[in-house]
Every structure is written in structure tokens, then in C-alpha cells.
């Protein structure tokens, strides 16, 4: 199957309407053409700055607009981030993702963020960040520090977007993706299913991703995790078969991308997750929490992988204990030498 960038909503809707077994079979055929069928890429996601976000995303418990149980926290110290990255490495992750609840990073944060990137790279993991909107200059800085992936989801279709968020435009999101690509980084971008959107909106989201000049290297598909206190806490559950169809269609129209089974896995049984892998999902987040939402523990994932004969992708070479100690010491020295350290922490709602 050739890689296309001219998919239409009508074509994608037609895929959704295929008999379920036919759709999954086609997706598995495409998957086997471009990927090893029994390999899954494993990432770990850490919240490096939690809560008090000025955006009004109706699904998000970190928004300052809603009363949830999420406690606001300042930007994590570099040492704590690297400690979490080391643990992720030991647990089997190959990529370490760092997320901050910001509208956009401020310039005073950039030195800290770049130290995090360099430190995680030194540990031997791929790096990914999601920091909100970024400028072209910030994208260049992050790329210069060695950031491999930048995540910025489109969330939903352009038509339904206004029902989800009003503090950031759809074009803002597309502009950020353009800055990321221009800086030479890989793109991680997907959406959330189950926010009350129509099947046409789901098709529209995938078309937006599949008609980018270059398909995202990673496409996370999230199932809404309903959180008390957010406007979407009572939205109707998405049908599991509809969710699996999303995975299958994403695999068919973006054949070379990694399709990540992302948030919501805690509410999926093993059978549903297995059908998602059959439909072309070949990446997961590993660990008991995704930012502030629950996720299956490592043991559960390893048990499921063993049942299915799935192997996680090979890690890069891991530094030995002495090397790790030296690397942490070097990063600590860089941080301690920076003037105005305390000024790098701030309230994101200001």
C-alpha cells in the first residue's frame, strides 16, 4: 500500500463503515507491510509541571478553570526528572516523555528543559516533550538540545474543536506542529476519542493528521478518561468497537506511523487491548500513571505481552552504574552554576 497525503473525509468515513472484521484484517495486512507484527514500542510519561494550566480544555483535570483533585506543582527539579528516567529505563521503556501543564513555556524555563533533555539522552532513552504551544525559536532550542519528539495533539476535528477548547485555536496547534517539523524533530500528534464527537469528527481528525506534509511519526489515540470536576465527567462512554475502528483506520491511512494506544487503557480489558494491537497499535505508555490519569502497571502489561507473544522494542545501550553517577553529577553541576535558579519556577496561571 502506498503512503498517501490526500485522504478525504468521505474516503475515511467509508473505511469506518466497513464490516468490523474486514477493517481489522485490512489494517493488520498494512501493519505487517510496514512494521514487525509482534513488536511494541514502550514509552513512559512524566508530568514535570502539574496543574494550574490556563487553558480550558474540557477534558483536562489540570485546567485552572475546573475544580478537580489535581494539586498544582511547580516545575520539577532536573535531578528528579532524571531519577524518574532511570527508573523508566530499568522498567523497559525506550522513550521518556515529559509533559508540562502550560499554555506555552516561558524563556526562563528553556535552560532547565534543555538540561532535562540532555540528561535523559545521556541515560540512553529517546526523548519527547509536550509543553503546549512553542515558537519556531523554542523549537530550534529544543532540537539543539537533542529532543527527538515533540507532542502536540490536535484532539479532534476542526469542526468539533470549539466544543472542547476556546483558549487556543486549531491553527495554533497546526502552527506548533509546523515549527516542530521545521526544527527537524519528529512529531507526536493524535487525538481523544469519546468527547461527544460524531463519527464524522473522528474521520476529520484522522484526515487532518494524514494530510500533513509528512505523517506524524507517532499517533497517540486516547480514550477519554472522565474526571470528576471537568465538563466532560458525564459524557457517554465510547463503544469499544468504535475505538478499535479508530485504531484500524489510523493504521491504514498512516501506514508508517507508530499508532500509540494511549490514555484510557486502564478501562480496557485484555481482549479490547488485544484487538487494538491486531488493528495496528504498536506503541503504548508504560507505568501506573499518565500525567495525572491512571494507567495499567508494568506487571499487567508484561503479562499481556507474554500471553500475546509481543516483545517491546530493544533499548539503546544503558550506561553502567559509574557512568550514570557521573552523568547525574555533571547535570547537577550545570544546574547549580546557573544564576537565578529559583526564578525558573513560576505560576503558569499568571
Swiss-Prot record:
What does the subunit comment say? Answer: Homodimer.
One example of the protein's molecular function in GO is:
2 iron, 2 sulfur cluster binding
* Cofactor(s) listed: [4Fe-4S] cluster; [2Fe-2S] cluster
* A GO BP annotation: biotin biosynthetic process
- Recorded E.C. number(s)? 2.8.1.6
Q: What is this protein called?
A: Biotin synthase
SUPFAM superfamilies referenced in this protein's UniProt entry, alphabetically: Radical SAM enzymes
The UniProt record gives the binding positions of [2Fe-2S] cluster as: 97, 128, 188, 260
Binding of [4Fe-4S] cluster occurs at: 53, 57, 60
What family does the entry list? Belongs to the radical SAM superfamily. Biotin synthase family.
Alphabetized, the UniProt keywords read: 2Fe-2S, 4Fe-4S, Biotin biosynthesis, Iron, Iron-sulfur, Metal-binding, S-adenosyl-L-methionine, Transferase
Please give the pathway this protein is involved in.
Cofactor biosynthesis; biotin biosynthesis; biotin from 7,8-diaminononanoate: step 2/2
| Catalysis performed (reactions) | (4R,5S)-dethiobiotin + (sulfur carrier)-SH + 2 reduced [2Fe-2S]-[ferredoxin] + 2 S-adenosyl-L-methionine = (sulfur carrier)-H + biotin + 2 5'-deoxyadenosine + 2 L-methionine + 2 oxidized [2Fe-2S]-[ferredoxin]
Function description: Catalyzes the conversion of dethiobiotin (DTB) to biotin by the insertion of a sulfur atom into dethiobiotin via a radical-based mechanism.
Q: Which residues form the Radical SAM core domain?
A: 38-257
Gene name per UniProt:
bioB
The answer to whether UniProt assigns keyword 4Fe-4S to this entry is: yes
- The first-level EC class reads transferase
How many and how are cofactors bound here?
Binds 1 [4Fe-4S] cluster. The cluster is coordinated with 3 cysteines and an exchangeable S-adenosyl-L-methionine.
Which cysteines does the record link by disulfide bonds?
none
